[in-house]
Amino acid sequence: MSRLYGAQSMVAPLRRVLVRAPDAAFGSVDPARWHYTATPDLPRARAEHAAFVALLERAGADIIRHDAPLTDRADAIFVHDPVLVTDRGAILLRMGKPRRRG
C-alpha cells in the first residue's frame, strides 16, 4: 500500500508537494490586519510561486495544487507552517496569528 502522506524528513527528496498560489485575497490584503509591512506585490508573488513550482517539478515532485478560493485567508499560501504530516494524515496545529485561526 502506498502512503498518501508523509513528511518525516526535512532533507529527503520531495515526492509529492501541496502548494497554493497567491490569489486575489493575498494581493488585496490590508497590511495592518495581517501584520505585513506593505501590501503584497501580487504579480511578483505569482511569478515567484510559478518559478518555485517549476523547480519542484524539474526535481521530480508530484505537485498537488490547492486552488479553492479562500477570500478571508490571505496567509493561506503558507501551507507548511501549521501542519505536522504523519504517515496516517495531517495534524493541524495552532496558528500563530489570530487571523489565521478558524
Q: What positions do the PLM features span?
A:
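The feature marks the mature, well-folded catalytic cores of soluble enzymes
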Residues: M1-G102
